[in-house]
């Protein structure tokens, strides 16, 4: 079944409050001579100029780095595009769902199985980290200007930042790694599973040092009797019977609300987390 996500409904523009509050703005018609004149006067005394327009539009509006840096050689020119400054797609417009999410492979990676329909992303999920990447580039260029007296050009793209977020799997592809078919099933081991609680929430385990943390987990969750079961009495046996163990853990977690599980595990020394909903975070 395919579903469509509906964004949160509010009388207040929450996206604007997150990204644009306290900003000051000035509208210029860069197709007019007066607008171009005002822009160039502003550039003379500016530290940073940022654009997200594709190359052809910049050329038309005369806002390329080659247009503005001669006016002020201390200017740091920052560019954020969909697909980069060069290449056959450099002229294309994009949003984060297209370039950061879909084109980078992230959209495919998070699918539960190869037959699952791709999912979408929250508003700005790719824009925010890409903006931080551009900010870091600009700050580095400003530091360089402190040392050299000269500005320059820095740039990044939505696709580049998406590729970095998916870097481990892209690197695997570069190594010609085998990408097995994905199936919706229990995890490969119970130490890294996602478990549903009585109140419909999800708890995640990330027990890497099993020799140290597994006994603590069993004690915290009142499962020490499993040590007496031959199927789980050693890590070798446990791994051989992990599907049976996974079912036992599913049943155990299903007896408790998430808050109860957190109380049991929070001081146990076990590495775990839980899935929040967005409106949960306003209380924390």
Residue locations for each model-derived region?
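Substrate-binding/catalytic subdomain of NAD(P)-dependent oxidoreductase enzymes
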Residues: 142-182
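Conserved hydrophobic ligand-interaction patch in extracellular adhesion modules
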Residues: 47-49, 272-275
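Mid-domain beta-loop-alpha active-site segment that forms a flexible
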Residues: 124-139, 158-166, 209, 213
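A short glycine-threonine-serine/GTX helix/turn-capping micro-motif
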Residues: 118-129, 153, 182-192, 203-204, ...
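A short catalytic or substrate-binding loop motif that flags glycine-/basic-rich loops and adjacent residues
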Residues: 10, 185-188, 197-198
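Aromatic-enriched alpha-helical interface/lid elements that frame and gate functional surfaces
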Residues: 191-272, 280-283
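N-terminal helix-loop segment corresponding to the beta1-alpha1 unit
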Residues: 1-150
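Conserved beta-strand edge residues that scaffold enzyme active sites
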Residues: 57, 279-280
């Amino acid at each position: 079944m395919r579903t469509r996500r509906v964004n949160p409904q509010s009388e207040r523009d929450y996206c604007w409050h997150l990204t644009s509050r306290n900003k000051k703005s000035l509208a210029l018609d860069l197709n007019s001579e007066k607008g171009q004149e005002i822009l160039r006067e502003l550039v003379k005394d500016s530290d940073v100029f940022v654009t997200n327009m594709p190359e052809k539009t910049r050329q038309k509006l005369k806002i390329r780095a080659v247009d503005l840096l001669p006016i002020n050689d201390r200017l740091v020119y920052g560019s954020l595009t969909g697909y980069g400054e060069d290449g056959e797609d450099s002229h294309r417009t994009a949003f984060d769902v297209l370039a950061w999410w879909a084109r980078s492979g992230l959209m495919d990676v998070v699918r539960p199985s190869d037959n699952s329909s791709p999912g979408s992303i929250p508003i700005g999920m790719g824009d925010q980290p890409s903006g931080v990447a551009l900010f870091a580039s600009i700050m580095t260029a400003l530091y360089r200007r402190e040392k050299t007296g000269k500005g320059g050009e820095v740039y990044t793209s939505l696709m580049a930042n998406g590729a970095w977020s998916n870097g481990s799997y892209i690197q695997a592809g570069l190594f010609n790694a085998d990408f097995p078919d994905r199936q919706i099933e229990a995890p490969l081991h119970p130490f890294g599973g996602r478990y549903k609680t009585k109140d419909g929430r999800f708890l995640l385990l990330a027990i890497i040092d099993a020799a140290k943390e597994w006994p603590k987990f069993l004690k915290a969750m009142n499962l020490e009797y499993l040590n007496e079961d031959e199927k789980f009495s050693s890590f070798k046996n446990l791994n051989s019977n992990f599907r049976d163990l996974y079912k036992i853990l599913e049943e155990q977690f299903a007896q408790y609300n998430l808050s109860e599980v957190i109380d049991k595990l929070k001081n146990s020394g076990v590495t775990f987390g839980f899935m929040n909903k967005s409106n949960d975070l306003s209380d924390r």
